[in-house]
Amino acid sequence: MIKIAVTGGIGSGKSYISHLLENMHIPVYNADNEAKRLTVSDAGIRGELIALLGEEVYKDGLLNKPLLASYLFSDPAHVLQINSIIHPRVRKDFTVWVERQEKCEIVGMESAILYEAGFQDTVDAVIMVYAPVELRIQRAMYRDGASEEQVRARIAAQMDDEEKRRRADFTVVNDGVQLLIPQLNRIVEQLKTEKFR
């Protein structure tokens, strides 16, 4: 089984590329969504967050996002602390998920923070979804109802696209001009070669 990751900045089209891969019968684990799920459902994460932030970190069984956000943004060390609680469990959950996909030749993981979380070590190849920054801003503003300033701040907080591109094995250009399916078909064919087995 070949494990791939799909990553890219906000508004690059990661989820759309993941959707196209799923249409090609390649199941994709969405690490960002699963991290949110595990933050509520995993007893270990819940216990550590309660020990760190108190019972009020969960309200009516749901994560108190404003409280967590205020903690995260008050000190950069807090981000590392929270990530050290959540990311190992996401990694373990991905491993269990992969085992359940035993009949698949290729499986994927979608993660906006693949490199920051160290998830690149769990896959055989990385696909970086690249789009021009102005297009990404427009997409994110439309999708999230965010202001341009908010989107630019989120872009600035993420790893630079060129660094992600340099580290990735493949790049899909999602600029609204280049066709996506032929790019993905070429990548999937390359993945099936000996290099990735």
Task: List PLM regions with ranges.
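Hydrophobic anchor at the beta1->P-loop junction of P-loop NTPases
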Residues: V6
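P-loop (Walker A) phosphate-binding loop of NTP-binding proteins
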Residues: G9, L21
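ATP-binding Walker
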Residues: S12
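Walker A/P-loop
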Residues: S15
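ATP-dependent small-molecule kinase phosphotransfer cores
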Residues: N33-E105
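ATP-dependent NMP and nucleoside kinases share a basic, alpha-helical "lid"
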Residues: K92-Q101, I106-Y142
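Small-molecule kinase domains that catalyze NTP-dependent phosphoryl transfer to phosphate-bearing small molecules
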Residues: D121-T122, V133, Y142, A146-Q190
